[in-house]
Amino acid sequence: MATALVSAHSLAPLNLKKEGLRVVREDHYSTWEQGFKLQGNSKGLGQEPLCKQFRQLRYEETTGPREALSRLRELCQQWLQPETHTKEQILELLVLEQFLIILPKELQARVQEHHPESREDVVVVLEDLQLDLGETGQQDPDQPKKQKILVEEMAPLKGVQEQQVRHECEVTKPEKEKGEETRIENGKLIVVTDSCGRVESSGKISEPMEAHNEGSNLERHQAKPKEKIEYKCSEREQRFIQHLDLIEHASTHTGKKLCESDVCQSSSLTGHKKVLSREKGHQCHECGKAFQRSSHLVRHQKIHLGEKPYQCNECGKVFSQNAGLLEHLRIHTGEKPYLCIHCGKNFRRSSHLNRHQRIHSQEEPCECKECGKTFSQALLLTHHQRIHSHSKSHQCNECGKAFSLTSDLIRHHRIHTGEKPFKCNICQKAFRLNSHLAQHVRIHNEEKPYQCSECGEAFRQRSGLFQHQRYHHKDKLA
């Protein structure tokens, strides 16, 4: 069966004329301006100019059918790049583009502000918007799909029709619930109705609404304030818009804390209150962990299913979540976005920064009972204690060498495989260990962080400083 592909931009606007009133339905299929990135690739696949050229090519611009098909194929290849991207990546882009097209325009703008990079990011942004809207008032999920109609020519109404329109303009709440809205934009009257173009009032369906030249009723209707739900304190006459604000206020009378978390006493109270106001209603049946959003539960369940759709283009490693891939890519790029405000040291992960900051916060360290060595984290102490227990449960299948840590075994495997995943962005030289890359980058940056306390001479590596001190300051060190 042949399928006819019709560009949305070629559809003529729908014109309806009745007694001097012309209604034009706005074209919903607007071009999505923000390009999207495929997982594991830093180059944007959905480049808007290429997509736009492909969508807007006209048959009249070519000499015939053969050239038209050839041109379409060429533009499609330039846009989707099938020689460098998988079928799943191309499918992801097309699904994303169509999904963003069918979104209401106001949601398109809100999503575009967050620059999402995947389908999961779009879902999370939209669910966050739904939760934010839910705090001010629940929306009716069965509300009919709206379409915007532009009233360009208006004829005066007479007699009973004029009174009926005036009566409907004064009724605010029923029309709002049924999906009708009237406003003025750029000097033109805009009427938003349900999908059939009819205005519902007092439970009755009337004929398509015709505008009149008396704007006073419309202005009086728009001037009515929107009803707000207020929460009143039983002890005092104070009123609150948010229910959580009332609960927090009530704690001042009872003396009971809003929650036992220390965050309630910190500067991040606003964000923490949002967490308290949202129940974790989505629970994983495998491990019992609960989540606030269904998208977070779906993302978590990939761990149990073993699904790993996100692959690194540099080394081929796969991940179950996009966040894991982005964090892994920092190994190849050398990016360390988390900065310690106390000493200026940078870290690749936020958990590494938190662990490091315990040194500055003077928290009680974890001490090894065997040798007295202290650690800022209990996990590091556990790893250290394997030295004393001589437990080396991780064995190399190639040479039989055993290691106490999995990370040591992974690093050792690179000797057999010849893998060098850490590449310099400046000269493209690759290294087996991240520490070797860090030392190499100092050559390009002319960085010498190790300084002699005696003479002030600086070195790129700690070993160079030790050699210098042994040779020039041997007497003072002794």
UniProtKB/Swiss-Prot annotation:
Give residue ranges of zinc fingers (C2H2-type).
231-253, 282-304, 310-332, 338-360, 366-388, 394-416, 422-444, 450-472
| GO CC annotation, single | cytosol
Q: Where is the composition biased (Basic and acidic residues)?
A: 164-181, 207-226
The organism's superkingdom is given as Eukaryota
Q: Which CDD domains match?
A: SCAN (cd07936)
Q: Where is this cross-link: Glycyl lysine isopeptide (Lys-Gly) (interchain with G-Cter in SUMO2)?
A: 17
**Coiled coil spans:** none
Q: Which compartment or compartments is the protein found in?
A: Nucleus
> Can you give the residue ranges of the SCAN box domain?
51-133
Which UniProt keyword terms apply here? Answer: Isopeptide bond, Metal-binding, Nucleus, Repeat, Transcription, Transcription regulation, Ubl conjugation, Zinc, Zinc-finger
Outline the inducing conditions: By serum stimulation.
One annotated GO molecular function is:
zinc ion binding
A GO biological process held by the record: regulation of transcription by RNA polymerase II
Q: What does this protein do?
A: May be involved in transcriptional regulation.
Q: What is this protein called?
A: Zinc finger and SCAN domain-containing protein 26
State which gene encodes it: ZSCAN26
